[in-house]
Protein backbone atom coordinates (compact mmCIF):
# COMPACT_ATOMS: atom_id res chain seq x y z
CA UNK A 1 0.00 0.00 0.00
CA UNK A 2 1.28 3.45 -0.89
CA UNK A 3 1.72 6.08 1.80
CA UNK A 4 1.44 9.83 1.23
CA UNK A 5 2.93 12.39 3.61
CA UNK A 6 1.00 15.66 3.82
CA UNK A 7 0.33 18.56 6.19
CA UNK A 8 -2.03 17.86 9.07
CA UNK A 9 -5.56 19.27 8.80
CA UNK A 10 -8.09 20.07 11.50
CA UNK A 11 -10.16 17.03 10.55
CA UNK A 12 -7.12 14.80 11.23
CA UNK A 13 -6.68 15.86 14.85
CA UNK A 14 -8.97 13.37 16.58
CA UNK A 15 -7.70 10.42 14.56
CA UNK A 16 -4.08 11.42 15.21
CA UNK A 17 -4.78 11.75 18.93
CA UNK A 18 -6.34 8.31 19.14
CA UNK A 19 -3.45 6.78 17.20
CA UNK A 20 -1.00 8.54 19.51
CA UNK A 21 -2.73 7.11 22.58
CA UNK A 22 -2.90 3.56 21.23
CA UNK A 23 0.65 3.56 19.86
CA UNK A 24 2.27 4.68 23.12
CA UNK A 25 -0.02 2.45 25.21
CA UNK A 26 0.80 -0.60 23.08
CA UNK A 27 4.60 -0.27 23.18
CA UNK A 28 4.63 0.65 26.88
CA UNK A 29 2.35 -2.24 27.82
CA UNK A 30 4.47 -4.67 25.84
CA UNK A 31 7.40 -3.79 28.12
CA UNK A 32 5.39 -3.41 31.35
CA UNK A 33 5.70 0.38 31.59
CA UNK A 34 2.84 2.80 32.34
CA UNK A 35 1.24 4.58 29.35
CA UNK A 36 2.24 8.16 28.56
CA UNK A 37 -1.38 9.34 28.32
CA UNK A 38 -4.14 8.62 30.85
CA UNK A 39 -6.85 8.54 28.17
CA UNK A 40 -7.45 8.99 24.42
CA UNK A 41 -8.89 12.42 25.20
CA UNK A 42 -5.58 13.59 26.67
CA UNK A 43 -3.74 12.57 23.51
CA UNK A 44 -6.38 14.28 21.36
CA UNK A 45 -5.88 17.50 23.36
CA UNK A 46 -2.13 17.30 22.70
CA UNK A 47 -2.75 16.67 19.00
CA UNK A 48 -5.01 19.74 18.85
CA UNK A 49 -2.48 21.93 20.67
CA UNK A 50 0.34 20.90 18.35
CA UNK A 51 -1.76 21.37 15.22
CA UNK A 52 -2.86 24.85 16.36
CA UNK A 53 0.67 25.97 17.21
CA UNK A 54 2.27 27.94 14.33
CA UNK A 55 5.74 27.09 15.66
CA UNK A 56 5.16 23.35 15.31
CA UNK A 57 5.30 21.71 11.87
CA UNK A 58 2.69 18.91 11.87
CA UNK A 59 2.30 16.22 9.21
CA UNK A 60 0.37 12.99 8.73
CA UNK A 61 0.84 9.75 6.83
CA UNK A 62 -2.17 8.74 4.75
CA UNK A 63 -2.84 5.40 3.04
CA UNK A 64 -5.91 4.72 0.89
CA UNK A 65 -7.54 7.87 2.26
CA UNK A 66 -6.96 6.85 5.88
CA UNK A 67 -4.64 8.66 8.31
CA UNK A 68 -2.26 6.05 9.77
CA UNK A 69 0.29 8.19 11.62
CA UNK A 70 1.65 11.65 12.38
CA UNK A 71 4.82 13.50 13.29
CA UNK A 72 5.77 16.98 14.51
CA UNK A 73 8.80 19.27 14.41
CA UNK A 74 9.09 21.94 17.11
CA UNK A 75 10.63 25.10 15.63
CA UNK A 76 10.89 27.49 18.58
CA UNK A 77 14.66 27.97 18.71
CA UNK A 78 17.91 27.19 16.85
CA UNK A 79 17.66 23.47 17.61
CA UNK A 80 14.57 21.68 16.27
CA UNK A 81 12.83 18.93 18.26
CA UNK A 82 10.98 15.92 16.86
CA UNK A 83 7.83 14.37 18.21
CA UNK A 84 5.67 12.81 19.09
CA UNK A 85 5.80 10.48 16.09
CA UNK A 86 3.17 7.76 16.21
CA UNK A 87 1.91 5.10 13.80
CA UNK A 88 -1.30 3.08 13.98
CA UNK A 89 -0.23 -0.16 15.73
CA UNK A 90 -1.80 -2.17 12.92
CA UNK A 91 0.21 -0.27 10.31
CA UNK A 92 3.69 -0.41 11.82
CA UNK A 93 6.84 -1.97 10.32
CA UNK A 94 5.78 -0.89 6.83
CA UNK A 95 8.19 2.04 6.37
CA UNK A 96 5.69 4.70 7.42
CA UNK A 97 7.77 5.89 10.37
CA UNK A 98 10.81 6.34 8.14
CA UNK A 99 8.82 8.48 5.70
CA UNK A 100 7.47 10.66 8.51
CA UNK A 101 10.98 11.09 9.90
CA UNK A 102 12.50 11.88 6.49
CA UNK A 103 9.90 14.62 6.03
CA UNK A 104 10.76 16.43 9.28
CA UNK A 105 14.50 15.98 8.68
CA UNK A 106 14.09 17.67 5.29
CA UNK A 107 12.05 20.43 6.92
CA UNK A 108 14.75 21.04 9.54
CA UNK A 109 17.83 20.59 7.37
CA UNK A 110 18.75 24.30 7.49
CA UNK A 111 18.65 24.40 11.31
CA UNK A 112 21.68 24.01 13.58
CA UNK A 113 20.50 20.56 14.58
CA UNK A 114 17.56 18.24 15.19
CA UNK A 115 17.06 16.29 18.40
CA UNK A 116 14.65 13.86 19.99
CA UNK A 117 14.12 11.70 23.05
CA UNK A 118 12.91 8.11 22.68
CA UNK A 119 11.90 5.31 25.04
CA UNK A 120 15.00 3.18 25.51
CA UNK A 121 12.93 -0.01 25.53
CA UNK A 122 11.69 0.72 21.99
CA UNK A 123 14.38 -1.02 19.94
CA UNK A 124 12.55 -0.37 16.67
CA UNK A 125 12.57 3.42 17.03
CA UNK A 126 16.18 3.40 18.28
CA UNK A 127 17.28 1.56 15.15
CA UNK A 128 15.22 3.83 12.88
CA UNK A 129 16.63 7.04 14.31
CA UNK A 130 20.20 5.74 14.23
CA UNK A 131 19.81 4.73 10.58
CA UNK A 132 18.62 8.28 9.80
CA UNK A 133 21.74 9.88 11.26
CA UNK A 134 20.76 10.48 14.88
CA UNK A 135 23.51 9.74 17.41
CA UNK A 136 22.93 8.59 20.98
CA UNK A 137 24.06 11.43 23.25
CA UNK A 138 22.68 10.83 26.72
CA UNK A 139 21.00 8.04 28.73
CA UNK A 140 18.07 9.46 30.68
CA UNK A 141 15.49 8.39 33.24
CA UNK A 142 12.06 9.87 33.71
CA UNK A 143 11.61 10.52 37.43
CA UNK A 144 8.59 11.42 39.54
CA UNK A 145 8.12 12.20 43.22
CA UNK A 146 8.16 14.83 45.94
CA UNK A 147 11.32 16.72 46.86
CA UNK A 148 11.12 18.84 49.98
CA UNK A 149 13.68 20.27 52.37
CA UNK A 150 15.52 23.32 53.59
CA UNK A 151 17.09 25.51 50.92
CA UNK A 152 20.75 26.51 51.17
CA UNK A 153 21.30 29.87 52.82
CA UNK A 154 20.97 32.83 50.46
CA UNK A 155 18.94 31.08 47.72
CA UNK A 156 15.35 32.04 46.89
CA UNK A 157 13.09 30.03 44.56
CA UNK A 158 10.09 31.78 42.98
CA UNK A 159 7.95 31.77 39.82
CA UNK A 160 9.64 33.26 36.76
CA UNK A 161 9.13 36.96 35.97
CA UNK A 162 9.52 38.89 32.73
CA UNK A 163 12.87 40.34 33.78
CA UNK A 164 14.27 36.82 34.32
CA UNK A 165 14.16 35.70 30.69
CA UNK A 166 17.44 37.36 29.69
CA UNK A 167 19.26 35.59 32.53
CA UNK A 168 17.62 32.27 31.58
CA UNK A 169 18.78 32.77 27.99
CA UNK A 170 22.33 33.33 29.21
CA UNK A 171 22.21 30.20 31.39
CA UNK A 172 21.13 28.17 28.36
CA UNK A 173 23.80 29.68 26.10
CA UNK A 174 26.48 28.88 28.67
CA UNK A 175 25.25 25.31 29.14
CA UNK A 176 24.32 24.36 25.58
CA UNK A 177 25.68 27.00 23.22
CA UNK A 178 22.19 28.25 22.31
CA UNK A 179 19.13 29.67 24.07
CA UNK A 180 15.62 28.29 24.49
CA UNK A 181 13.74 31.43 25.47
CA UNK A 182 11.07 31.19 22.76
CA UNK A 183 10.15 27.75 24.04
CA UNK A 184 10.24 28.99 27.64
CA UNK A 185 7.96 31.94 26.83
CA UNK A 186 5.42 29.82 24.97
CA UNK A 187 4.62 27.16 27.54
CA UNK A 188 0.91 26.44 28.09
CA UNK A 189 -0.59 28.86 30.63
CA UNK A 190 -1.43 26.07 33.09
CA UNK A 191 2.30 25.38 33.61
CA UNK A 192 4.52 27.53 35.84
CA UNK A 193 8.26 28.06 35.39
CA UNK A 194 10.54 28.81 38.34
CA UNK A 195 13.95 30.36 38.96
CA UNK A 196 16.51 30.15 41.75
CA UNK A 197 18.03 33.49 42.76
CA UNK A 198 21.33 33.76 44.65
CA UNK A 199 23.03 37.06 45.42
CA UNK A 200 20.51 38.91 43.25
CA UNK A 201 21.28 36.73 40.20
CA UNK A 202 19.23 34.01 38.53
CA UNK A 203 21.39 30.88 38.88
CA UNK A 204 18.88 28.24 37.74
CA UNK A 205 15.54 27.82 36.04
CA UNK A 206 13.12 24.97 35.46
CA UNK A 207 10.41 25.40 32.85
CA UNK A 208 7.70 22.87 33.75
CA UNK A 209 8.77 20.92 36.85
CA UNK A 210 5.37 19.25 37.23
CA UNK A 211 5.22 17.97 33.62
CA UNK A 212 8.36 16.12 32.55
CA UNK A 213 7.69 16.24 28.81
CA UNK A 214 7.90 20.04 28.64
CA UNK A 215 10.37 20.55 31.48
CA UNK A 216 13.88 21.73 30.69
CA UNK A 217 16.17 23.10 33.35
CA UNK A 218 19.62 24.68 33.52
CA UNK A 219 21.71 25.69 36.53
CA UNK A 220 25.14 27.18 37.10
CA UNK A 221 25.99 24.35 39.50
CA UNK A 222 24.54 21.15 40.88
CA UNK A 223 23.82 22.97 44.15
CA UNK A 224 21.70 25.49 42.24
CA UNK A 225 19.86 22.68 40.42
CA UNK A 226 19.13 20.92 43.69
CA UNK A 227 17.95 24.22 45.17
CA UNK A 228 15.53 25.05 42.37
CA UNK A 229 14.04 21.53 42.46
CA UNK A 230 13.74 21.52 46.24
CA UNK A 231 12.32 25.03 46.26
CA UNK A 232 9.65 24.09 43.72
CA UNK A 233 8.89 20.97 45.73
CA UNK A 234 8.39 23.08 48.85
CA UNK A 235 5.94 25.30 46.94
CA UNK A 236 4.02 22.42 45.35
CA UNK A 237 2.04 20.92 48.23
CA UNK A 238 1.06 17.37 47.27
CA UNK A 239 1.70 17.88 43.54
CA UNK A 240 4.68 15.71 42.51
CA UNK A 241 7.61 16.87 40.43
CA UNK A 242 8.50 15.01 37.24
CA UNK A 243 11.53 15.45 35.00
CA UNK A 244 14.10 13.73 32.78
CA UNK A 245 17.51 13.29 34.38
CA UNK A 246 20.79 12.40 32.60
CA UNK A 247 22.01 9.36 34.54
CA UNK A 248 25.67 10.20 33.87
CA UNK A 249 25.10 13.05 36.33
CA UNK A 250 25.55 10.47 39.06
CA UNK A 251 25.57 12.80 42.07
CA UNK A 252 22.33 14.50 41.00
CA UNK A 253 20.78 11.10 40.23
CA UNK A 254 21.61 9.75 43.70
CA UNK A 255 20.49 12.99 45.34
CA UNK A 256 17.13 12.76 43.55
CA UNK A 257 16.64 9.15 44.63
CA UNK A 258 17.59 9.99 48.21
CA UNK A 259 15.12 12.90 48.28
CA UNK A 260 11.99 11.07 47.21
CA UNK A 261 12.15 10.75 43.41
CA UNK A 262 11.61 7.36 41.77
CA UNK A 263 12.54 6.09 38.33
CA UNK A 264 9.56 5.57 36.01
CA UNK A 265 11.29 4.57 32.77
CA UNK A 266 14.57 4.83 30.83
CA UNK A 267 14.87 7.12 27.81
CA UNK A 268 17.57 8.20 25.36
CA UNK A 269 18.52 11.64 24.01
CA UNK A 270 19.59 11.53 20.35
CA UNK A 271 20.90 14.31 18.11
CA UNK A 272 21.54 14.97 14.44
CA UNK A 273 23.74 17.91 13.49
CA UNK A 274 25.38 20.32 15.91
CA UNK A 275 25.92 19.04 19.46
CA UNK A 276 28.10 20.23 22.33
CA UNK A 277 28.49 18.44 25.64
CA UNK A 278 26.45 20.51 28.13
CA UNK A 279 28.25 22.53 30.79
CA UNK A 280 26.97 22.97 34.33
CA UNK A 281 23.85 21.13 35.44
CA UNK A 282 20.87 20.54 33.16
CA UNK A 283 17.69 18.52 32.62
CA UNK A 284 16.32 17.97 29.08
CA UNK A 285 12.71 18.01 27.95
CA UNK A 286 11.14 15.30 25.81
CA UNK A 287 12.40 17.29 22.80
CA UNK A 288 16.02 17.73 23.92
Q: How should these model regions be labeled?
A:
Residues 1-3, 10, 56-58, 62-64, ...:
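Intrinsically disordered, low-complexity, positively biased terminal segments
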Residues 17-58, 62-70, 173-193, 197:
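Active-site rim helix/loop that mediates acceptor-substrate recognition in acyltransferases
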Residues 75, 88-90, 94, 221:
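Active-site acidic-Proline motif in GNAT/NAT acetyltransferases
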Residues 78, 113-119, 135-148, 263-275:
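Conserved catalytic-core motifs of GNAT/GCN5-like acyltransferases
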Residues 140-166:
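Surface-exposed beta-loop interaction hotspot
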